[in-house]
Amino acid sequence: MSALRCSVCSAPLHPDGRSLRCVRRHSFDLAKQGYVNLLRAGVDAGTADTSEMAAARADFLATGRYAPLVDVLARVVEASGEPEFVVDAGAGTGYYLAGVLDRVASAWGLALDVSAPALRRAAKAHPRIGAVVWNLWEPWPVADGVADVVLDVFAPRNTAEFHRVLRPGGLLAVATPGAGHLRELVTELGLLDIAGDKTDRIAESLGDHFEPVDVDTASHTAELDADEVRKLVLMGPNAHHLHRGGLGAKLDALTGATEVTFEFDVSVLRRKE
């Protein structure tokens, strides 16, 4: 991973046995699960996905309910030409990045996420993924102008770092829930509501560094059994709010099947020179 930089001094990192090391001898051990933690300090409780959330996400995404979103993201990466390096900011378990790399044989991927439990899975999700524990709100340990595409799927958006790590003319794909996403569960279970007009606000917030290219939407409905609904809820931010409105009790009481809408918006933007 020659694109990685030391999180202490910003010098290039190079493999040294089971570690990554810079010329100033700052060293970071590779975990046996295949990822590296470059954080300099601990993370506040609640900001990272837990082991339980990562497990629920892996199980639910394996059902293929979010495969249409992978298709959209893969088309964006393919449209960038012959990409060599894709950064997934907030990669989680690596599901989306692995799906993209399956379609784009020329590319390697870097999964950045603050959750070590999630990155244990991301590191094994695809042979061309490198996984790094990092807080996306901090300057990333990645060299300038090395990425052909940056993916941001339901994750924090650090505009300055998007711009810095992308090559001139590189593409940014920001995936957000559509207005109808999980609407049945929002009504039935009282999930956190989905904000409207996100795509307009994304283009506006990134406008100083990026120009809009396209907005693509993928939507479908599927019948989920009670266990699938539980995993769907527990893999995301609602897992931090199980006591809100008795959500945990409502999940425990679920029986039968529920028709659920899945809707994803992908805003594609190009890095300004």
Language-model region placement:
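A short SAM/SAH-binding and catalytic strip from SAM-dependent methyltransferases
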Residues: 147-161, 176
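Class I SAM-dependent methyltransferase Rossmann-like catalytic core
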Residues: 46-72
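N-terminal auxiliary segments of SAM/dcSAM-dependent transferases
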Residues: 1-47
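A short acidic, Gly/Pro-enriched loop at the edge of an enzyme's catalytic core
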Residues: 138-149
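Class I SAM-dependent methyltransferase SAM/SAH-binding core
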Residues: 85-87, 92-139
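Conserved class I S-adenosyl-L-methionine
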Residues: 171-201
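A short glycine-rich, Lys/Arg-flanked "PGG" loop and its adjoining helix->strand segment in the class I
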Residues: 159-171
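Conserved Class I S-adenosyl-L-methionine
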Residues: 216-273
